[in-house]
């Protein structure tokens, strides 16, 4: 069922007026300034309409027992206590203090420990809706979606399926194999990564795409919306993505045909077509960056890469910022000279990765990507300060990080003299801090020397791994598979139609071709 803003004013009042009576245990809470207190909780810890409130929620809302913020956190309505619902820390508090009411900090529902269920109260519901609407307006999304009006078919489906599906920690909904239609493993592994991208999933499952194409049947975004519905329908039989393949062939003709294609090339082509077909989904909202729009693809995948070219004579700096969807990283063993790895002793731990002598890490690749590069005498530029052509250095850094960072390890080398696959093992972490590679951190690095970030509390640049695409075989003959994170620590291997459970060790020991990381903390604009 799609959740959208409720109608305002009289319609909402009429809806609430016919609601059933609420919980009989609310009397102990509804005293003195209870409405003011409840509004404060919704404003600060549930809907969080302002940037300041969202930052406060991200930093403050952790379980007071285990220090975790992901296990369905609830807040006591009688005192300042946050506790996990999943691990029953909030239950223990309620029993010890006899505080029988708590609020779900994700969805705003009120839970009664005496009733052992979420409860309804007309007065509380009015406050919740009012504060939610205020938060939407602060974020500029309050008027984006109309009230959901089910079709006749949807009404019939609701009659035959009145029960809500309960999602448990062992639930595998969203996992579904894909039939290989003839060397289409390159497409299947990318589809698995996209369908398990949290914000993309939320976008499509909330029916937010508004197609403006003359022929919706040719819209790749409409097909992706249908694909998400198929993946999260609960069906376990492998899906046949024939229509998706046809649309990709239609809109990206260089990928047409049954020969093996590059998964990275397919990813970029798919994002490009989705970006072009998302016209209208941003509801006319202007993008902050003129180089990209505000469609869901750009909101999730687009970052800004800063290039600083420094004159070696006057040291004047020319800066440009370009959008990117992925970061392609050179590997040792390629014809491109690789920066010396791992200076110093063995056994270092850098950015959460085991850094052993002779082992290449993702951090090594990023260090090389962001180091200053001397352009040489054959690539002189005209300096605006010197008014003449001078030698210069160029350095790339991250000006703006995307919500989903995709790292492309350049394993396929094509040159005039050779075509080969680079099989160098690259160690990559479950959690990644991109702070050292930001343009704002450039001053902390001198001459390309890596330094640990001094502000360990800077969570804006921290990422978690959620998908890995691998290539087995040679350049001429190979096969793509992917690892997908379903829950916090549950991983599955997707090999076309076959889905099997995988361990974290299986994931981290894999070769790695495309690495997908998701921001741990989000700040909505």
UniProtKB/Swiss-Prot annotation:
* GO CC entries: cytoplasm; nucleoplasm; nucleus; SAGA complex; transcription factor TFTC complex
Annotated localization: Nucleus; Cytoplasm
Q: Which residues bind Zn(2+) 2?
A: 63, 66, 84, 89
Q: Which residues carry this modification: Phosphothreonine?
A: 147
Write the Enzyme Commission number(s) for this entry.
Answer: 3.4.19.12
User: Among its keywords, does the record have Membrane?
Assistant: no
Q: Which SUPFAM superfamilies match?
A: Cysteine proteinases, RING/U-box
- Reactions that this protein is recorded to catalyse: Thiol-dependent hydrolysis of ester, thioester, amide, peptide and isopeptide bonds formed by the C-terminal Gly of ubiquitin (a 76-residue protein attached to proteins as an intracellular targeting signal)
Q: In which tissues is it expressed?
A: Moderately expressed in various tissues including heart and skeletal muscle, and weakly expressed in lung and liver.
Q: Which family does it belong to?
A: Belongs to the peptidase C19 family. UBP8 subfamily.
Q: What is this protein called?
A: Ubiquitin carboxyl-terminal hydrolase 22
């Amino acid at each position: 069922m799609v959740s959208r803003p409720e109608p305002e004013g009289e319609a909402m009042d009429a809806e609430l007026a016919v609601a059933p009576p609420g919980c009989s245990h609310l009397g102990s809470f509804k005293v003195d300034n209870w409405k003011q207190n409840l509004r404060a909780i919704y404003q600060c810890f549930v809907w969080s309409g302002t940037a300041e409130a969202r930052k406060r929620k991200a930093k403050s809302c952790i379980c007071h027992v285990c220090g975790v913020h992901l296990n369905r956190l609830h807040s006591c309505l009688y005192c300042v206590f946050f506790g996990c619902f999943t691990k029953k820390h909030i239950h223990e508090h309620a029993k010890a203090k006899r505080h029988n009411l708590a609020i779900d900090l994700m969805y705003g529902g009120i839970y009664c420990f005496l009733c052992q269920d979420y409860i309804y109260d007309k007065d509380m519901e009015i406050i919740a809706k009012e504060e939610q609407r205020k938060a939407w307006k602060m974020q500029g999304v309050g008027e984006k979606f109309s009230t959901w009006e089910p079709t006749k078919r949807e009404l019939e489906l609701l009659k035959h399926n009145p029960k809500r599906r309960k999602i448990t920690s062992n639930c595998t909904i969203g996992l579904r194999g894909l039939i290989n239609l003839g060397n289409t493993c390159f497409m299947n592994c990318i589809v698995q990564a996209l369908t398990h991208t949290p914000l993309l999933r939320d976008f499509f499952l909330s029916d937010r795409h508004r197609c403006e194409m003359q022929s919706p049947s040719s819209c790749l975004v409409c097909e992706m919306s249908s694909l998400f519905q198929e993946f999260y329908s609960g069906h376990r039989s492998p899906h046949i993505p024939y229509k998706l393949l046809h649309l990709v062939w239609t809109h990206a003709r260089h990928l047409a045909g049954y020969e093996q294609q590059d998964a990275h090339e397919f990813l970029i082509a798919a994002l490009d077509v989705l970006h072009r077909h998302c016209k209208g989904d941003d509801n006319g909202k202007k993008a902050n960056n003129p180089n990209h729009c505000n469609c869901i693809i750009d909101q999730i995948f687009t970052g800004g890469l800063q290039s600083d070219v420094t004159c070696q004579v006057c040291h004047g700096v020319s800066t440009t910022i370009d959008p990117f969807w992925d970061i392609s990283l050179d590997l040792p063993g390629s014809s491109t000279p690789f920066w010396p790895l791992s200076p110093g002793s063995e056994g270092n731990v850098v950015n959460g990765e085991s850094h052993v002598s002779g082992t290449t890490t993702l951090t090594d690749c990023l260090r090389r990507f962001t180091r200053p590069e001397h352009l040489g005498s054959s690539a002189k530029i005209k300096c605006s300060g010197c008014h003449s052509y001078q030698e210069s250095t160029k350095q790339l850094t991250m000006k703006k990080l995307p919500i989903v960072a995709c790292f492309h390890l350049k394993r396929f080398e094509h040159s005039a003299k050779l075509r080969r696959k680079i099989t160098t093992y690259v160690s990559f972490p479950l959690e990644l801090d991109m702070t050292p590679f930001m343009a704002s951190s450039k001053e902390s690095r001198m001459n390309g020397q890596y330094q640990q970030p001094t502000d360990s509390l800077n969570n804006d640049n921290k990422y978690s791994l959620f998908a890995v695409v691998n290539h087995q075989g040679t350049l001429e003959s190979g096969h793509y598979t992917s690892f997908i994170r379903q829950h916090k620590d549950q991983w599955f291997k997707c090999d076309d139609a076959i889905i099997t459970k995988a361990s974290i060790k299986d994931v981290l020991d894999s070769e790695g071709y495309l690495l997908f990381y998701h921001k741990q903390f989000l700040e909505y604009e």
